[in-house]
């Protein structure tokens, strides 16, 4: 699989959607929920706001954010793959009081009006875009001035020969792929290592964000620098 290929990435997430949440819990020992809440906390969400979840997947972040913007607000989740969106809509239907909507869409061309959102998150999505720089530009375009955004993803270690990178390789090859193999998804999760290798590191992410028009950008390592949170102000 070619990292960043839009059609292949969409097919990948359609394929893994039924097992995605279960594998996330197992592979992170549930810690992904904490990291995602840290991303949401950066937004300082308030009732009445319109928030955007780009590459929303099965909708777990969007549903948490929807609790924060009640009453009077709205959370819009966009994803290119239809199978995760079906799961997101089913989850939302069980919590029908939440102001959340899910649509199929392209993170590089959302179709939203300029300055539409009061805040946005993108979790494990920027790394999978064909053009991460263009993704950050579109993210900036749809945010009102002064709005906050958070981009959560795997962190590419700065030293490929260092201990952090060595642990990441061990984790991906000896834990992630074997567990995915049990679910019949070995090929899909083997893609992770290649996608991380081509993903911009922390310094480049900050630079790309500033070039995209963000006023502030900082990258915060999480989970012993295995994950990273790019915190942005439009």
Where are the model-predicted features located?
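N-terminal, positively charged/glycine-rich alpha-helical extensions of SAM-dependent methyltransferases
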Residues: 1-19
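C-terminal alpha-helical "lid/dimerization" subdomain adjacent to the S-adenosyl-L-methionine
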Residues: 7, 155-208
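Conserved alpha-helix/loop element of class I SAM-dependent methyltransferases that forms part
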Residues: 29-49, 64
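Class I SAM-dependent methyltransferase SAM/SAH-binding core
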Residues: 50-109
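A short acidic, Gly/Pro-enriched loop at the edge of an enzyme's catalytic core
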Residues: 108-120
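A short SAM/SAH-binding and catalytic strip from SAM-dependent methyltransferases
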Residues: 118-132
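A short glycine-rich, Lys/Arg-flanked "PGG" loop and its adjoining helix->strand segment in the class I
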Residues: 133-148
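Core SAM-dependent methyltransferase catalytic element
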Residues: 206, 212-215, 221-234
């Amino acid at each position: 699989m070619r990292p960043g290929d839009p059609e292949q990435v969409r097919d990948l997430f359609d394929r893994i959607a039924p097992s995605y949440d279960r594998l996330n819990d197992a592979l992170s020992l549930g810690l992904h929920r904490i990291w995602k809440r840290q991303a949401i906390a950066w937004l300082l969400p308030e009732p009445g706001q319109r928030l955007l979840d780009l590459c929303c997947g099965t909708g777990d972040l969007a549903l948490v954010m929807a609790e924060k913007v009640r009453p009077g607000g709205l959370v819009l989740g966009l994803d290119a793959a239809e199978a995760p969106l079906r799961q997101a809509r089913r989850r939302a239907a069980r919590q029908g009081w939440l102001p959340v909507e899910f649509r199929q869409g392209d993170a590089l061309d959302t179709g939203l009006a300029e300055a539409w959102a009061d805040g946005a998150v993108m979790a494990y999505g920027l790394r999978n875009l064909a053009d991460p720089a263009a993704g950050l530009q579109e993210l900036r375009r749809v945010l009102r001035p002064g709005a906050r955004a958070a981009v959560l993803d795997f962190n590419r270690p700065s030293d490929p020969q260092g201990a952090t990178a060595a642990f990441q390789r061990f984790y991906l090859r000896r834990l992630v792929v074997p567990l995915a193999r049990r679910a019949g998804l070995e090929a899909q999760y083997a893609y992770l290592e290649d996608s991380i290798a081509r993903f911009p590191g922390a310094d480049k992410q900050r630079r790309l964000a500033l070039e995209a028009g963000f006023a502030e950008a900082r990258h915060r390592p999480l989970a012993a620098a295995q994950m990273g949170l790019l915190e942005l102000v439009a």
